[in-house]
Amino acid sequence: MFDLKATIGRLAQGQTLGRQDAWMLFEQMAFGHASHAQLGALLMALRVRGETVEEIVGAALAMRARMVPVKAPADAVDIVGTGGDNAGTYNISTCAAFIVAGAGVPVAKHGNRALSSKSGAADVLSALGVNLDQTPADIERCIAEAGIGFMFAPTHHPALKQLMPVRVDLATRTIFNLLGPLLNPAGVRHHLIGVYSRAWVEPLAHALGDLGSERALVVHGSDGLDEITTVGPTFVSMLARGRVRSFEITPEMVGLVRANPAELKGADGKWNAVALRRVLEGQPGAYRDIALFNAAGGLIAAGVVENWPDAMALARASVDGGAALATLNRLVEASQPEGHVQPY
C-alpha cells in the first residue's frame, strides 16, 4: 500500500522518486487522498529540490489515466507554454495556434485561465467570443468545422480541481506548469511547447519521447520567454524519429528584426483579445512577428515543413491570405450552443 506521509518525508529529505512511485503519488493526489496541507508540502518539496524527468513522466501517466478524452486527427498539434515566465506578454501561442490552423494543420489546443499571469489562453479566447463550456463532442466538432478546438483544462482534468486553490495560494511555479503541456486530452503527438527555464528544454523533449510523442519542439527564449522569442536567440530541443537534437534559432535566421521586450507586453484577456485579432487581420509589428515565428515552429512540429524559411512563408500566407482570421471566426461560431445567434 502506498504511504503518502512517508513519501512526503522522502521528498522533504531531498530524495527523488522513480517513475512508478511518482505515478502512485499523483494517483493518490488525483483520487483526493491528500489534504491541502499535504498537497502544498508535496508541490513545494518538488519545486525546491527540482523535479526529475522520471517524476514528470510518472505524474503525467497518472494524470492522463484520469482525464476526459477528446478525439482529434492523428496529425493534430498543440501549441502551448508552461507559463511562469513572469514576462507579461500578450497571448503569443494562442495567436500562433490560429495561424497554424489557418495553414491547414488541425490544432487541439489545451489550456487554462491565468494562474501566474494576467491572461491565460482561456481568458483571451473567452474575450474573443469562444464558448469554453463544451463537451468532448462539441470540441471534436470545432476541430472538424473550424480546424481548431480548445480544451479547457479544468473540464478535462476533474482530478485537478482540488489542486486549484492550492496552486493559487502558492502563487509560484510548480510541477503542474511542466505537466500541463503533457496532459493534452486529445492525446496529440505533435507539440510546440515553451518552457519557463532553459534547464527544462532538453529534459522535457526526452519526457515527451518517453510518453509516446512523435514530433515536438521544446523552446525557451534567451530573454526568459516560454515562447520562441524575437528579442534574441531561442534554445530549442527537437524530438523527431525517436531522437532529440538541440540547437538555437534567431530572428535574423527567418528575416525578422529583433524586438524590444516592451513591444511584446500585453494586459488582461480583453486587451490581449484585441491585439490578437489585429495580428490576424494583418497589422504589422512586433506582435505579428513573434506570432509568425511561433507559428513556424508549430508547423515544423506538425511535420508539414522541415525548414524555417518554408515554415515562415506558410505562416505569413495564413495571415495575409485571411485564413487565420477566418479560422478564429469559425471557431467562435462553431463553439456556440445550438440555437445561439452570434452578434455582429
From Swiss-Prot:
Cofactor: Mg(2+)
Binding positions for 5-phospho-alpha-D-ribose 1-diphosphate per the UniProt entry: 81, 84-85, 89, 91-94, 109-117, 121
Alphabetical UniProt keywords: Amino-acid biosynthesis, Aromatic amino acid biosynthesis, Glycosyltransferase, Magnesium, Metal-binding, Plasmid, Transferase, Tryptophan biosynthesis
Family annotation (InterPro entries): Anthranilate_Pribosyl_Tfrase, Glycosyl_Trfase_fam3, Glycosyl_Trfase_fam3_N_dom, Glycosyl_Trfase_fam3_N_dom_sf, Nuc_phospho_transferase
Binding positions (Mg(2+) 1): S93, E227
Classification via SUPFAM superfamilies: Nucleoside phosphorylase/phosphoribosyltransferase catalytic domain, Nucleoside phosphorylase/phosphoribosyltransferase N-terminal domain
Protein purpose: Catalyzes the transfer of the phosphoribosyl group of 5-phosphorylribose-1-pyrophosphate (PRPP) to anthranilate to yield N-(5'-phosphoribosyl)-anthranilate (PRA).
Name of the molecule in the record: Anthranilate phosphoribosyltransferase 2
The organism of origin for this protein: Ralstonia nicotianae (strain ATCC BAA-1114 / GMI1000) (Ralstonia solanacearum)
Gene: trpD2
